[in-house]
A protein has these predicted regions:
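Hydrophobic/aromatic residues located in beta-strands of well-ordered beta-sheets
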Residues: 5, 51-53, 98, 129, ...
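Short, acidic/turn-prone active-site loops that include or flank metal/cofactor-
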Residues: 11, 75-81, 238-240
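Conserved alpha/beta core of the MobA/IspD/sugar-nucleotide pyrophosphorylase nucleotidyltransferase superfamily
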Residues: 168, 182-265
Length: 265
């Protein structure tokens, strides 16, 4: 199976302009731009046939080419990473599976992506897959504190009995009544922003209008659900280090600490 990992990256992030080029120090104190760290995370994945940085910005493209990454240039009309992957796919050779490893997902363990590839290899009917982690009650309380402080703390997902996503939200779902967090494990599953798509699912996504739910939540994957394209939720184990994305400038210190904890140079 020909698996292409695509790393969509844009310079004009609404929350953090220039984010892909932000320098982050690793375990040894060496600073590398975010896009390079995301690329290095991608090349550690077993089973990938190719890795490409996908962007519409020459500053990002030049930086990526400088550390040896293959680059696919896309138009500035792409509204999100999934649309960017769909456009980039048109410039690639025959591909059986596309993995969208978002440009700020530098701490994503290779095993998460490998689990998606394995799931899609075995479930031939699956069109889209994405990982999620079941959270401990203490981790949910930390997310509640982030939310109360007005910061984006993460996206949560609920799924049906067959493991297909019912909904994703930037709010904590499901509702947690009194006592829901009394045990060690919670009913909350944190979504990890990595996706595996069949090419036909990407084409269908690009041809589908933006949905109201997608706009309200600011979550691109909801377009699949609104269009009736199921998303398989693959449960993965929470890593030993904090799994953070660079969403806000305030996240830099925590991400550098996580890089050090993971032993990533």
């Amino acid at each position: 199976m020909n698996v292409a990992i695509l790393i969509p990256a844009r310079f004009e992030s609404s929350r953090y302009p220039g984010k892909p080029l932000v320098a982050l120090k690793g375990a040894s104190g060496v600073a590398k731009p975010l896009i390079q760290r995301s690329y290095e995370a991608a090349v550690r994945v077993a089973g990938a046939s190719s890795v490409h940085v996908v962007t519409d910005d020459l500053r990002i493209a030049d930086q990526a080419a400088g550390f040896g990454a293959a680059v696919v240039m896309t138009s500035s009309e792409c509204r999100n990473g999934t649309e960017r992957c769909a456009e980039a796919l048109q410039h690639l050779d025959s591909t059986d599976l596309v993995v969208n490893l978002q440009g700020d997902a530098l701490l994503t363990p290779p095993g998460f992506v490998e689990a998606l590839i394995e799931h899609m290899r075995g479930a031939v009917e699956a069109q889209v897959a994405t990982p999620a982690m079941r959270l401990r009650s203490g981790e949910v309380r930390a997310l509640q504190a982030e939310e109360a402080a007005g910061r984006v703390g993460g996206t949560t997902v609920v799924a049906d009995g067959a493991g297909r996503a019912l909904y994703f939200s930037k709010r904590l779902i499901p509702h947690l009544p009194d006592g829901a967090l009394d045990g060690e494990m919670s009913p909350v599953r944190l979504h990890v922003g990595v996706y595996a798509y069949r090419p036909e699912a990407l084409a269908a996504y690009a041809a589908t209008p933006v949905s109201e739910l997608e706009m309200l939540e600011g979550l691109e994957q909801l377009r699949f659900l609104v269009a009736g394209i199921p998303i398989a939720v693959v449960e993965v184990e929470t890593p030993a280090f904090a799994l953070r994305e660079l969403n806000n400038p305030e996240d830099v210190e925590a991400i550098e600490a996580a890089l050090a904890a993971a032993g990533l140079e």
